């Protein structure tokens, strides 16, 4: 009887162990799946982080490229501006320098030939060219009369006679006309005098 009891108990124990093993085995794959999913997620996150880092690196490199391009553009603009500035003033500078260089040379020549001090002290008298009609007595007399009126000095004619008498006569006529008051500034005017006892107190109206 005891043997039978033992035999009957053994399969119960075996079934219990099998059921426990089955439970453990059924739980294990679930845990493994979760771990796999977590690992996959972590890997994906790492990949995303790497991608983000790569993108950041790319952005940085793009920014660097943009900055270098901007610098190149500025350099190009500066170069073009410098070229245009250098080309523009070349044309007007050359004649200006030539004119400036001519002036001091001319002034130096004038100073060497005729000192400035002598020019200031000398009277500004016009130098007349030689008259080709000097042989003509009428033309020479007219020229001498013009000089006589300007300078009020007696001069000789081509015949050797002095014009001093003519000059004195014309001056006397002018004085008599001005004193009489008949003509003033080329216009005739009337002079009315108020007679008084004292001739020095006569008033001209």
Swiss-Prot record:
Residues 1-205 are annotated as: Disordered. Coiled coil: none annotated. Residues 80-122, 170-185 have a biased composition (Basic and acidic residues). Residues 1-25, 194-205 have a biased composition (Polar residues). It comes from the Eukaryota. Residues 32-79, 123-132, 146-162 have a biased composition (Low complexity). This is Uncharacterized protein DDB_G0285917. It comes from Dictyostelium discoideum (Social amoeba).
């Amino acid at each position: 009887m005891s043997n039978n009891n033992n035999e009957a108990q053994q399969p119960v124990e075996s079934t219990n162990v099998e059921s426990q093993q089955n439970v453990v085995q059924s739980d294990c794959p679930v845990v493994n799946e979760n771990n796999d999913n977590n690992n996959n997620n972590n890997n994906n996150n790492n990949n995303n982080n790497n991608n983000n880092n790569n993108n950041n690196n790319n952005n940085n490199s793009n920014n660097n490229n943009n900055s270098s391009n901007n610098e190149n553009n500025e350099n190009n603009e500066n170069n073009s501006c410098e070229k245009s500035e250098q080309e523009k003033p070349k044309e007007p500078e050359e004649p200006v320098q030539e004119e400036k260089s001519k002036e001091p040379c001319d002034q130096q020549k004038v100073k060497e030939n005729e000192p400035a001090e002598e020019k200031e002290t000398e009277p500004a008298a016009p130098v007349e060219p030689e008259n080709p009609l000097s042989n003509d007595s009428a033309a020479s007399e007219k020229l001498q009369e013009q000089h006589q009126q300007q300078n009020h000095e007696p001069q000789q004619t081509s015949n050797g006679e002095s014009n001093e008498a003519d000059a004195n006569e014309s001056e006397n006529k002018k004085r008599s006309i001005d004193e009489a008051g008949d003509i003033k500034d080329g216009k005739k005017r009337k002079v009315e005098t108020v007679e008084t006892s004292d001739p020095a107190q006569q008033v001209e109206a």
